[in-house]
Each structure stands twice: as C-alpha cells, then as structure tokens.
C-alpha cells in the first residue's frame, strides 16, 4: 500500500485507489486516495513553506545544491523505480529506467540555471531608474499525466524548485507509484518541510480543486 506525501510526512487516507497491471489487468497495489481536504492540506503546507522564506529566500547556491543532490538520489533509485513503473504503466523495463534517468537530467539541467536567474536594468536617461527583479511565484500546483509520469513530473518540478517555489503535485490515478519512488528520492535531498507535496486522487475531485 502506497501513501501520499503531505507537509513532510507520508500519510494515508480513508479511501484507496487500486492500481492495476495493464498487461494482466490484475491488481498491482493500492494507494491512498486523496480527498479535497488532503489537497487543501497540501496547498496550505506549500504556502507555509513559501511564506517562511526557507525556500523562496534561500540563496541560489543552496538551491543548486538541492537540485544536484536530488539528481543523485534519483539515479540511485532508477532500477527500483523502473521495475515499479514497468508494472504499473506497461513500459519496457529499459524505457522505464530511461524515464528515471531523464528525470535526473532535468534536475541537473535546472540546477545549472538556479543561480542564473537575473534581473535587468535599462538606461532610460536622467530622472529615470528602470529595473526588473524576478521573484518566486510562491506555490506551483502541477497535474501530471499517466503516460510519462516520472519524466513529466521532473520537467515541471525541477524548474519550480530552481526558482524557489513550493510545489503540490497530483499524480495520475493509472500510474502513480513511480512518482512515489521519485518523491521518496527527492525527499532525501533535505528540502524544507512543505516544499514538495504529492497527492493521488480523482481528477474530477482533487484535480478540479
């Protein structure tokens, strides 16, 4: 049985979703089915993290370190994650492993950008001062599809963290387990509490919220 990750802890829910092996149509595992209340808790946790400044005001070099550590942790679980993703999604084991490696590369790529988010200053003449500063949005909510869940999750999660945003991710009901392996690896990097939250629920309920 797999859990949601909210506010720095793996948590269960009253209801469960069944995840089936598409090759056999047989049940593979269950995962906690997040409710609207769970989604709200995740959003509030992300907002607290953003408001605390631990992530949004962290020095760029610190965010670089976090993202590189995340990439290392993802590579370390690539074989385990590939087996999980293969069973729940129907990919070949090689394609599933490549998806985890691709996820790690996204974090490596955006680690290289995390300390290069620069403002601009345009000289407009006497009496004018013109400059642009980029600030984190605060909270990024991301809904991930079933077909490339690990890769697509990393593609949007990595830049959000690089820019200093806290994130709430809704995983797909059909193949949420590989993303649990992904987040378990990410957590080891030591991000601030509430920086990343993972929930699995029905799109018409949790996703719509």
Each language-model region and where it sits:
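Histidine- and aromatic-rich ligand-binding microenvironments
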Residues: 4, 18, 27-41, 190-195, ...
